Amino acid sequence: MVGKSTLLSVLASASVAFAACSLDSHCPEETPCCSQYGECGTGAYCLGGCDPRMSFSLESCVPEPVCESASYTFTSMDGITSNTKYLGDASKSNWVYSGSPVIYNDNVLLTMSANSVGTVMASSTYMWYGNVKAKFKTSRGQGVITAFILFSDVKDEIDYEFVGSELTTAQSNYYFQGITNYDNELNITLSDTYANYHEYEIDWTPDEITWLVDGQVGRTKKRADTWNATANQWNFPQTPARVQLSLWPGGLASNGAGTIAWAGGEIDWNSEDIQNNGYYYAAFESVDISCYNAKSAPGTNSGKSYYYNSVLGTNNTVIDSKNATILSSLLATGTNMTAGESAAASGSTAASTAATVPGLTGSGGGGVGDNHSDDGSSSSDSSSGSATSSSSGSSSTGSSGFSQGDGSTSTSKSSADSLVANQERVLKGSLFAGIVAVVAMMAL
């Protein structure tokens, strides 16, 4: 087990060695890919979570495998691959993980041992609208956060998050390109999430998002209500996203005060679950993904991969293409997908000073729920409201097929750039995601 002080020392030294990236500071050519944790590298940095807007060029990121409708159960680790081994072949890997997933009683347990930073699993394919359901039991305890979200490479996000000290509340939330707005959060009331399996559902169309629990609508958000007149755009999730399942320590003592308060307080690393099992855990039984299957963009999945043709990162800049998605090695990038091929084929390791797997060499935010670092209130106070699940229908049909802004596909800058300042101050996602792999590798 890695002590917290040791972990932080590793991260501090690593942050000096490798370049950070943002909307204002792109990655250098030698390490061109900006991971979802805000650091530059090659290999896995160029795969899931690579933000093309912050990378050396749009082409630095490897194209994203298109949506595939599928039902997943978790009776074994087949199809679940470590992010240290995944090279972009979604036909061989359904899920990519950091941390320590465990198969138990036909569930995959996302585990978090004492003083660790948890586990995340992300789908290898991307949904561009559609429907996703996950059946699971959350973890429990103050400071312990379970999450089921959709997260795009340009940081569009649709969330379910669960605070372990509030077991009758599911927090629903959404973000456009990582822009924080705590008024977007709404609570859904339900029975004990640790004791009971519930089926959580996100129905996402170009016109609205519906959150359902056990088939009952808990919340609906219409795109028509998200217009930003200043930026001349819809602040609505609209780009291809991976499904992400996670367990993370919102109540880690080193986290910001706002995050700890939102998470219900500091984690008890000597709790009943730690003593009896050796870890906190969330139990996921199944995930069902249904693609949107539009006949014309947005929302198609007729090709092999998605890529962006503009730094705007909106739905009218997404191209459904036949471009390849598989790297030859962890030295490769979107512009040189065969780098390191000879070394990989021979089984040797090519020399490189570049970071190749996000999280192994640095910390950061990025991609698994919101860190709530600007919010000093508790989760029950920070929500803009609550809603009890009610019976009503949800449909993925009848979309207008909207195109962002004025509908152009220009690669020039637009009024969207007025939001850059807000985006720059946001570290999206859980505090753990960027450092899970450090713990995993150091424990080997």
UniProtKB/Swiss-Prot annotation:
E.C. number: 3.2.1.14, 2.4.-.-
PROSITE patterns tied to this protein: GH16_2, PROKAR_LIPOPROTEIN
GO CC, alphabetical: cellular bud neck septin ring; fungal-type cell wall; side of membrane
Pfam families, A to Z: Glyco_hydro_16 (PF00722)
Glycosylation sites noted in the Swiss-Prot or TrEMBL record: 187, 228, 315, 323, 336, 371
Active site: residue positions: 157, 161
Cellular localisation: Cell membrane
Signal peptide: 1-19
InterPro entries named in the record: ConA-like_dom_sf, GH16, Glyco_hydro_16_CRH1_prd, Glycosyl_Hydrlase_16
Propeptide residue interval(s): 416-444
Disulphide bond pairs: 27-34
Reaction(s) this enzyme catalyzes, per UniProt: Random endo-hydrolysis of N-acetyl-beta-D-glucosaminide (1->4)-beta-linkages in chitin and chitodextrins
Protein's membrane topology: Lipid-anchor; GPI-anchor
GO MF assignments: glycosyltransferase activity; hydrolase activity, hydrolyzing O-glycosyl compounds
Lipid-modified residues, GPI-anchor amidated serine kind: 415
Chain sites annotated for binding chitin: 161, 248, 259
Domain GH16: 57-271
Key words, A-Z: Cell membrane, Cell wall biogenesis/degradation, Disulfide bond, Glycoprotein, Glycosidase, Glycosyltransferase, GPI-anchor, Hydrolase, Lipoprotein, Membrane, Signal, Transferase
GO annotation (BP), single: fungal-type cell wall organization
Record keyword Membrane present: yes
Coiled coil segments of this chain: none
Main location class: membrane
Subunit structure comment from the entry: Forms homodimers as well as heterodimers with other crh protein members crh1 and crh2. Dimerization may be necessary for the transglycosylation activity.
Family label: Belongs to the glycosyl hydrolase 16 family. CRH1 subfamily.
Biological function: Dual chitinase/transglycosylase that plays a role in cell wall architecture. Chitinase and transglycosylase activities are coupled. Required for the polysaccharide cross-linking at the septa and the cell wall. More specifically, transfers chitin to 1,6-beta-glucan in the cell wall.
Protein name stated in the entry: Crh-like protein 3
Organism: Botryotinia fuckeliana (strain B05.10) (Noble rot fungus)
Lineage summary: Eukaryota, Fungi, Dikarya, Ascomycota, Pezizomycotina
